[in-house]
């Protein structure tokens, strides 16, 4: 049976069994146009607090690598590719962790676009892990 885990439970689970934690989302911003892909980066005000201080650079490096993979696939990137938001996931994660926004309700959700998103994320993961 499927079980819904909250953000803290998902983060704790990933900290213990995963090499990284990537949460995929389509932004619920209500816009009538596709604003593109981006990752949620750690706000400056949290970067000196533990455990964030020991891991935020890994989170941002993973996010930047994923965005670059998506850019390579020709996907739209929102502004500079990141947005600072305080998230439980990155605040308590001890492994590279990122929330990826892959567009919004107005984005193209065709099989072709979903395949391009998947290919871009794989490119970014391979680059991050040096494969």
Please annotate each region the language model reported.
Residues 1-131:
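Active-site-proximal helix/loop segments of hydrolytic enzymes
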